[in-house]
Design a protein with these regions (language model features):
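N-terminal cap/lid segment of alpha/beta-hydrolase-fold proteins
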Residues: 30-79
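Short beta-strand element of the alpha/beta-hydrolase
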Residues: 81-90
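Active-site glycine-rich loops that stabilize anionic/oxyanionic intermediates
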Residues: 89-94, 252
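Alpha/beta-hydrolase active-site loop
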Residues: 132-188
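Primarily recognizes the serine-hydrolase "nucleophile elbow" in alpha/beta-hydrolase
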Residues: 171-243
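The feature captures the conserved acid-bearing segment of alpha/beta-hydrolase catalytic domains
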Residues: 224-279
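C-terminal catalytic histidine-bearing segment of alpha/beta-hydrolase fold enzymes
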Residues: 262-265, 269-313
């Protein structure tokens, strides 16, 4: 699915924030933040619902993002490896899940010398009543959610195929991700980044945005590698000629999510392309970086995305 969205005017210069506006900034990171576009994001100028942020138990849920923004977390220059990731939060394209787990992951990436560009991409616009329903806490005795059976074709694990509103939001989110890749590469020298080692990490629907960005195939706006944390493709996949290496992580019982990522892995292997898949027997939505991070960073070294760790004498 190629985004039917014309590129907007990117925010050409990011603003250095020195006043501690993000209290949870990883220690030692330099932080920049700015709107992704100058003026309104192209295509969604008519959106009017206000942004709503809800916090609970260290998690942050942000609804009605209509003006995407980026925040950049850089490791110290002396530790920078040249690798960078655009981080795409999850939330079913309806909300962005941020907070403690996101901060933990960014700190871990910075600790490995990897720059992180956190993108808050556009999401479905919800009324106040819809947000109240979506953000209501689950009863303590509620059974775990059951996932409807979904036939996976061409690795497409979209649970709501044909939903026009979600299809539109996915196009907008992909356009935002493309613009973020362009922005990141344009600042490569300043941020000590190799423009040929800029990948994406997407959680849940964020993984779908990453795969959509890959499939759009825009020059200068495709990821050099993709890390997906229980985030399958949300559209039919054809393996591109310049297919990036994949690192896929999921729970073993996450229904169509697991099935979709298994299908993606099989497609890459059928083409003798680098891909690694880990399916953990853990509760759904419990995939913290402490579970998969060590193996991921070893894989990044094996793929020459990161420098190898010097051997101990």
């Amino acid at each position: 699915m190629t985004p039917a969205v014309k590129p907007g005017r990117p925010a050409l210069a990011l603003v250095l924030l020195t006043l501690g506006l993000f209290a949870s900034t990883p220690a030692g990171a330099q932080q920049y933040a700015a709107p992704l576009y100058r003026g309104s994001a192209p295509g969604s100028e008519s959106w009017t619902f206000p942004v709503v942020t809800r916090e609970r138990n260290g998690g942050v849920s942000r609804y009605n993002t209509r003006e995407p923004k980026v925040a950049v977390y850089l490791p110290p220059a002396s530790k920078a490896t040249g690798a960078a990731v655009v981080m795409l939060p999850g939330g079913g394209l309806r909300v962005l899940g941020l907070g403690a787990e996101t901060d933990e992951a960014m700190a871990r990436f910075n600790g490995e010398g990897i720059a992180v560009v956190l993108l808050e991409y556009r999401t479905l616009q919800l009324s106040p009543e819809e947000i109240d329903r979506a953000s209501a806490p689950r009863p303590a005795n509620a059974p775990p959610p059951r996932f409807a059976k979904l036939e996976i074709h061409n690795a497409n694990a979209n649970p709501a195929p044909g939903d026009r509103r979600l299809d539109e939001v996915l196009r907008f989110a992909v356009a935002d991700a493309q613009e973020t890749l362009r922005l990141t590469r344009s600042h490569a020298a300043e941020w000590h980044i190799d423009p040929h080692r800029v990948g994406m990490i997407g959680t849940s629907a964020g993984g779908g945005v990453a795969f959509g960005t890959m499939l759009a195939g825009q020059p200068g706006a495709t990821p050099d590698f993709i890390i997906s944390i229980f985030g399958p493709a949300l559209q039919d996949v054809t393996v591109p000629s310049n297919a990036p290496p994949l690192f896929l992580v999921t729970e073993s019982n996450h229904g169509p999510v697991t099935d979709g990522l298994v299908a993606l892995f099989a497609m890459w292997k059928d083409h003798d392309l680098p891909a690694e898949l880990h399916a953990y027997e853990v509760p759904n939505f419990s995939m913290r970086v402490s579970l998969w991070g060590s193996r991921l960073f070893d894989w990044m070294r094996e793929q020459k995305i990161l420098r190898p760790v010097p051997a101990k004498k």
